Each structure stands twice: as structure tokens, then as C-alpha cells.
UniProtKB/Swiss-Prot annotation:
<dbReference type="InterPro" id="IPR020055">
    <property type="entry name" value="Ribosomal_bL25_short"/>
</dbReference>
<comment type="function">
    <text>This is one of the proteins that binds to the 5S RNA in the ribosome where it forms part of the central protuberance.</text>
</comment>
<comment type="similarity">
    <text>Belongs to the bacterial ribosomal protein bL25 family. CTC subfamily.</text>
</comment>
<dbReference type="GO" id="GO:0003735">
    <property type="term" value="F:structural constituent of ribosome"/>
</dbReference>
<dbReference type="InterPro" id="IPR011035">
    <property type="entry name" value="Ribosomal_bL25/Gln-tRNA_synth"/>
</dbReference>
<dbReference type="GO" id="GO:0022625">
    <property type="term" value="C:cytosolic large ribosomal subunit"/>
</dbReference>
<dbReference type="InterPro" id="IPR020057">
    <property type="entry name" value="Ribosomal_bL25_b-dom"/>
</dbReference>
<dbReference type="InterPro" id="IPR020930">
    <property type="entry name" value="Ribosomal_uL5_bac-type"/>
</dbReference>
<keyword id="KW-0694">RNA-binding</keyword>
<dbReference type="InterPro" id="IPR001021">
    <property type="entry name" value="Ribosomal_bL25_long"/>
</dbReference>
<keyword id="KW-0699">rRNA-binding</keyword>
<dbReference type="GO" id="GO:0008097">
    <property type="term" value="F:5S rRNA binding"/>
</dbReference>
<feature type="compositionally biased region" description="Low complexity">
    <location>
        <begin position="191"/>
        <end position="207"/>
    </location>
</feature>
<dbReference type="InterPro" id="IPR020056">
    <property type="entry name" value="Rbsml_bL25/Gln-tRNA_synth_N"/>
</dbReference>
<dbReference type="Pfam" id="PF01386">
    <property type="entry name" value="Ribosomal_L25p"/>
</dbReference>
<feature type="region of interest" description="Disordered">
    <location>
        <begin position="191"/>
        <end position="213"/>
    </location>
</feature>
<protein>
    <recommendedName>
        <fullName>Large ribosomal subunit protein bL25</fullName>
    </recommendedName>
</protein>
Amino acid sequence: MKVVAFERSVQGTGASRRLRNSGKTPGIVYGSKDPALVIELDHNALFHALRKEAFHSSILDLEIDGKAQKVLLRDYQMHPFKPLVLHIDFQRVSASEKVHMRVPLHFTNADTSAAVKLQGAVISHILTELEVSCLPADLPEFVEVDLAKIEVGHGIHAKDIALPKGVTLVLHVEQENPVLANARIPAVKAAEPTDAPTAPAAAPGAEAPKDKA
């Protein structure tokens, strides 16, 4: 995915405010052996790009003043209540160095699983992304989680899924194996009141009939 930017010569709070007022977004590019570079981008183009899933988990071609470089989106700040991108950070990547990146999970085949079709189970997505490590060329836009064989009362764990070639999970604890999704039967609804007639309540002051001796 291509991103167009221009080098920014003026910095500071006032300069950034004027930049935003002119329809631009300030940003920075850092990493590798090159010095950090402050940039500016067209706000509307950036705003729409941020709505695309691939923009967050892919290697991007950042073109600055006509020169392209490979980068990852590392951070961005939004206005608290306006649809306004305040700032964005990109990190340069090297083709020979592995990157750590959080990639989205795409869940498939839930509707065709026996747990859902035959037992009426409900599938819950516990996680929506995973952190992986790989070379930039191997970075997937997403990781697929196949739910076809999920069983009621059980879950699909991170180590259960097949990752693309060259991609490994980043687990911060060796024994870590988080649940990605599980299947459960919904709780039975409370029983509805029966329609059987009930005896009328006794009138105030009325005595209950006595048994005959």
C-alpha cells in the first residue's frame, strides 16, 4: 500500500496547529540507521487509509518527496471527539531484519461447524489479533482461524492454528497459549409461567371452610 508524504521543515505546537488547519497531518518516520524525519501528509487521504485493516498490519511504501521506503504504522493519535488525525508515527523496516507486529484474526467456518449446526452453540471471539514475528516480506495482512472443528466446551488456542511460512508467534511467557475463540451452549431461559388456572384468593375477612367432623 502506497502512502505519500512530504518532509516538514517547521516544527512545534504552533506549526502543527497551522498544518492541521490547512488539511495536513504532522508525522514522523524513525528507525534503521537513518535519522528521524518529520513529515506531513494529506489528512483526508490518511483518514481513509486508517479505516483499512491492511494499513495497520502491512508493510507500507512510504513515498517522501518522490523517494520510497518500507515502513510500518507504529502509532497514531486521534482527536477525542472529532474525526481528526492529530499525528502519526511510521517505523522504517529492513528486508533482512524480523519485525514484531500485531495482525488481525479472521475467523472462518463457524457456521459450518457441528457445534453450531447440530448443537446450537454460540462462538465467542476472545482475541481479535495476535503478535507475530517474521521478515517484512513474510508479514501476513491477517491470520486465519478455522473454526470448523471447534467443540462445545472447548476453545481454539493460539498454538492450534497454522501460521503462514516464515511466521512465528510472539509469546511473552513460554507456556503462554491464549484462547482465541470458544464454543458454548447458551443458558436455558427461565421457564415461562404456566397457564393452569389458580384458585381465587379468599375475600378479606372470609373464613376458610372447616372440615366436617
